[in-house]
Amino acid sequence: MNSLLATPPVPPHFYEHCRLSPSRSMSSTNPSGNRKRKAEDDYLPSDHDTRMSASPSNSPAFPPRPLPASRQIKRSRPNISGRPLSLSRLLETLDTDALRSVLRSMCDRHPELATEVVHTAPRPSVSSALQVLNNYQSALHSSIPLGGNSSSDYAYNRVRQHIVNLLDALSDFTPHFLPPNESQTSTALSYLDGATEILHRLPRWDTPQNNLEKDAAYEEMAKAWILVIREAGKRGGGIQLQYGGWDEKLSKHNQTAGGKLQDAVDVLSSNLGWMGTNQDLSNNQGVDASSIRQQLLSGTYGSGMPLKVGRW
């Protein structure tokens, strides 16, 4: 009875209609999904990670920047050969004496360059001129023989050329700082002060004839002092001479020179005396005016004068 009521078996042709056909998505799936995972699969990048890490090729956020010119590597020359230095590099290797020699030789060969150099070169200052004179002075003293009598004829003959060089430089620099070439009397006085000090340091020799060159230099220096003092007295009432302490400085120079600058001292004294007289007169006039004003204010003006009686 039970076997009669059992469900009859499904015919085979019904299975053919109920079977599902594979879809397109299933056919495109990765065949590796059906296989087992291996340990090395954890270290392989996925498609998602690859897409996220890759930057677009046409992204405008970070444009390519060229390397600066200083960091670009220079290509080596295929064929190297010797060549002379450029003018700028050549001048860097020359010291002061060599450069002066080159410039002097060029001016000798091309006289028209001398005028151009004179107008182009900066005007020498007092310190630079005195430095040149001090260099000649140092060369002179270093040539004096050690030991023995340093003021003998032998010592004079050893340093005579250095004396000539110093005195020649002194005679060339001094007119440059005198009026009318030098318009500032303060600059001229400053130069004369330093140049006279250098002249004092020239040695005195036992033979009087050997001292003639130094004595002649003192005479020229005295004339230079007189010229500058007279020019300074014309400007500003000679205030530069009055308040610069030049009377004391020149008096000290004259004492060191053995009285060979006395003419310059006399000219300076006359200028200061004239200015002092004018100042005393102006002071006296000021005192008289103030005295009369005080008498007028106090009502005592004319009290000491005799009273005139009768017709005026």
Curated annotation (Swiss-Prot):
This is Tethering factor for nuclear proteasome STS1. One of its GO terms (cellular component) is nuclear membrane. GO terms for biological process: nuclear protein quality control by the ubiquitin-proteasome system; proteasome localization; protein transport. It comes from the Eukaryota. Keywords: Cytoplasm, Nucleus, Protein transport, Transport. It comes from Ajellomyces capsulatus (strain G186AR / H82 / ATCC MYA-2454 / RMSCC 2432). GO terms for molecular function: proteasome binding. InterPro entries: Cut8/Sts1_fam, Cut8/Sts1_sf. Involved in ubiquitin-mediated protein degradation. Regulatory factor in the ubiquitin/proteasome pathway that controls the turnover of proteasome substrates. Targets proteasomes to the nucleus and facilitates the degradation of nuclear proteins.
